[in-house]
């Protein structure tokens, strides 16, 4: 260990990169976000269980699910602008505080043995809105706490964290709900508090991201810039639209499986275990996502993922046993996590730093916004035609998406569009040193960010 310019650095070989654990700010960002995600997962799943078990109404459960996913449609674009204008660390801290207070109101109402669907839906909306701001800020900050060559590894580590939390959070939430309805919400409050304490220690950015020319722009103009940036990249926008369709399908599958378990007399904990199986599959998928991203082009990953989903999803129509559903969720989540790692790395790598929030918000609007429509539509579809026919519908939609992905990404010109869109933004010029020589900005960043 040595000290240069006030920064503690580890001695390493000429070509070796330090591990991600060597970066203090990345460790704190990862840990604080892990607790925040765990809190959101515990309360998010408990919202649906609470309404479904208390009212017995699939449409009410779908309404709460819609409220929790609606911010993906309404909040994404304004949030992207604000993330590019404000200090991202402070945005994250504010989001944690607001979510903590909102979820605490549910815990208090349950301690008083009171449940209102409108209250649960409102808190679900507030929590999800703050989660949008938080996720955009966190993803943008990753680029500032690790060097460019380790961005893919950092994204894979973050996705593995989220999938691992899904694996743990869903069964824990289901088990706590089985013991007492207020327990998942009170646990979320405690986790949010721990997340806040961790984020306070994060150095973060001293100022908001620089804006070219320092020109003041209105929000509508800033949103238009982000939309135009995505729309001008043919391959990028096509991939996003197809993934948006698959997200709509998966949201419908999740709600349908919950109803299947309840119809068959299963407990809330059974749903948690099925979701945990998906979390385990996602964890393994995230771990191999970086490896896959280095060996396959994005268009090849898209075809592989959608064809596999189309082949395995119809199994839910014929096999209702919890073990079979758990295996299905393991496979679909494994592939989904690998696609997510590749997609996030792709987007962050090609997007300029001062546009990370806006471009990320457009991506999340297209990819996750469709999920809100999936939750709402599936709730009413279930009441109209039942679980079996609903599963047939969502499976059929996935088959269509697989055919579209195969046709679009194997056509002449698809490879050229992929290469054009994936060209990274200009890299910074070498840093001038007093003796007249220059330094590689990557090396400079590594030395500045490492704290043993």
Features from the language model and the residues they span:
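Transmembrane alpha-helical cores of Major Facilitator Superfamily
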Residues: 34, 66-70, 97, 156-164, ...
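Hydrophobic alpha-helical transmembrane segments
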Residues: 117-128, 150-210, 269-272, 276-280, ...
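Intracellular juxtamembrane helix-capping segments at the cytosolic ends
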Residues: 47, 133-146, 338-351
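Juxtamembrane intracellular "pre-TM" segments in multi-pass secondary transporters
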Residues: 3-27, 205-241, 424-430
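Hydrophobic core of transmembrane alpha-helices in multi-pass small-molecule transporters
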Residues: 34, 115-133, 244, 324-338
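Transmembrane alpha-helix termini and helix-breaking/packing motifs in multi-pass membrane transporters
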Residues: 48-55, 106-112, 168-187, 259-264, ...
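Helix-loop boundary and gating motifs at the non-cytosolic
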Residues: 11-71, 228-278
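C-terminal transmembrane bundle of multi-pass solute transporters/carriers
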Residues: 74, 78, 85, 89-91, ...
């Amino acid at each position: 260990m040595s000290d240069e310019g006030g920064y503690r650095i580890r001695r390493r070989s000429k070509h070796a990169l330090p591990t991600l654990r060597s970066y203090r700010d990345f460790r704190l960002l990862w840990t604080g976000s892990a607790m925040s995600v765990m809190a959101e997962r515990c309360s998010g799943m408990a919202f649906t269980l609470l309404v479904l078990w208390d009212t017995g109404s699939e449409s009410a459960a779908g309404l709460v699910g819609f409220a929790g996913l609606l911010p993906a449609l309404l909040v994404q674009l304004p949030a992207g602008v604000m993330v590019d204008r404000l200090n991202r660390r402070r945005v994250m801290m504010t989001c944690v505080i607001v979510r903590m207070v909102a979820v605490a109101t549910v815990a208090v109402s349950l301690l008083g043995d009171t449940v209102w669907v409108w209250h649960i839906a409102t808190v679900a909306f507030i929590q999800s809105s703050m989660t949008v701001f938080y996720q955009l800020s966190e993803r943008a900050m990753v680029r500032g706490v690790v060097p460019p060559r380790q961005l893919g590894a950092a994204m894979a580590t973050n996705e593995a964290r989220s999938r691992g939390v899904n694996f743990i959070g869903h069964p824990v939430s289901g088990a706590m709900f089985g013991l007492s309805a207020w327990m998942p919400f009170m646990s979320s409050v405690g986790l949010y508090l721990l997340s806040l304490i961790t984020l306070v220690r994060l150095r973060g950015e001293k100022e908001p991201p620089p804006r070219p020319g320092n020109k003041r722009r209105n929000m509508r103009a800033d949103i238009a810039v982000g939309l135009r940036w995505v729309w001008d990249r043919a391959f990028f926008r096509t991939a996003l639209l197809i993934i948006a369709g698959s997200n709509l399908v998966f949201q419908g599958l999740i709600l349908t499986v919950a109803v299947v378990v309840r119809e068959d007399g299963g407990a809330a904990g059974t749903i948690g275990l099925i979701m945990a199986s998906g979390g385990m599959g996602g964890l393994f998928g995230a771990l191999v996502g970086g490896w896959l991203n280095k060996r396959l082009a994005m268009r090849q990953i898209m075809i592989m993922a959608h064809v596999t989903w189309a082949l395995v999803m119809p199994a839910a129509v014929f096999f209702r046993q919890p073990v079979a559903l758990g295996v299905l969720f393991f496979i679909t989540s494994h592939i989904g996590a690998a696609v997510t790692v590749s997609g996030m790395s792709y987007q962050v790598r090609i997007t300029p730093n001062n546009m990370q929030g806006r471009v990320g918000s457009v991506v999340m609007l297209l990819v996750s916004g469709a999920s809100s429509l999936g939750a709402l539509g599936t709730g009413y579809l279930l009441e109209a035609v039942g679980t079996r026919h609903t599963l047939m519908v969502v499976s059929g939609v996935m088959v269509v998406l697989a055919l579209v992905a195969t046709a679009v990404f194997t056509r002449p010109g698809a490879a050229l569009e992929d290469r054009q869109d994936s060209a990274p933004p200009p890299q910074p010029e070498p840093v001038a040193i007093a003796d007249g020589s220059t330094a590689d900005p990557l090396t400079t960043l590594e030395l500045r960010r490492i704290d043993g």
